[in-house]
Amino acid sequence: MQIADQSKRVVYLGTGRRKSAVARVRLIPGSGQLWINGRNGADYLQNNPIYLNLVKAPLETLGLENSYDIYVNATGGGLTGQADAIRLGIARALCQLDIENRKPLKTEGYLTRDPRAKERRKYGLRKARKAPQYSKR
């Protein structure tokens, strides 16, 4: 979705989900800063290059690394789930920016929501699929 904020700048919105993590992303024309939950993105992701590269991958695919400031509100899950959710949210926001961005992002797999989530525990079992030890006698 595309909206205008108080200073009349255009804001592009995208929502990403992964496992139990949800990330609401705002892209604002700027210098390429990343803010997650009010903190610097590198600090929030513990300066882990894997997470940082994961989050910035959609922008690098389109060559827009230093064109937009990214503001993220991420809740739930752990760092891996949140990083994947942020990547999906950024990719969806970039599709709002220009419909031509959709094809390269889809080719790289950045617009695909990973459906894997924790399976619920069933009664009579110790975990989702682990059964108590069987004793024949």
Curated annotation (Swiss-Prot):
SUPFAM superfamilies: Ribosomal protein S5 domain 2-like (SSF54211). Residues 118-137 have a biased composition (Basic residues). InterPro entries: Ribosomal_Su5_D2-typ_SF, Ribosomal_uS9, Ribosomal_uS9_bac/plastid, Ribosomal_uS9_CS, Ribsml_uS5_D2-typ_fold_subgr. The gene is rpsI. Residues 106-117 have a biased composition (Basic and acidic residues). This is Small ribosomal subunit protein uS9. The lineage of its organism: Bacteria, Bacillati, Cyanobacteriota, Cyanophyceae, Acaryochloridales. Keywords: Ribonucleoprotein, Ribosomal protein. Belongs to the universal ribosomal protein uS9 family. GO terms for cellular component: cytosolic small ribosomal subunit. HAMAP family: Ribosomal_uS9_B (MF_00532_B).
